[in-house]
């Protein structure tokens, strides 16, 4: 019966590539062959951020990756957390980011979560937690509703926009621990750096980070 339901579901809702939305063929899973060959993976060890020990991104933030992440965040694309999270877990393993005791995420404001219906970074973090077998918890809270970073240009302005926006929760779960911080998109890195600073101030031993995609260029 379960197999029959599976076939009916695939007939009515054929699986599509998470990047280009084209129909998947044969043994293709999540990403079509064309997107796998044409989408640039982000190189290992290229990202450097203040307050963060190591950072890894699955892809460059451009083309179909950019469009797909826009669906994820703004067009009820919460289902994309599953394939994204699995890819992020594999990336974290390949880049040795998994020697941590806790996984957490960059939180959105309560207002934005209410409007969107979900916190996309929390969904990613929980998939990564399940895949890696590492506990996941809410260690940060957004205490001020600031301007969206996407509407601000320049690292200095973005950095100023996030100062004092985040607060550490449960210091006893943070102190002395190595933490993997999860975010969806990295541009200048200002938000991730501020979240890492807050975690370190609360006593974290080390903060690593993994993101779906990055448009980041290292800042001096």
List each model region and its residues:
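Glycine-rich phosphate/pyrophosphate-handling loop used in enzymes and phosphotransfer proteins
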Residues: 1-183, 187-220
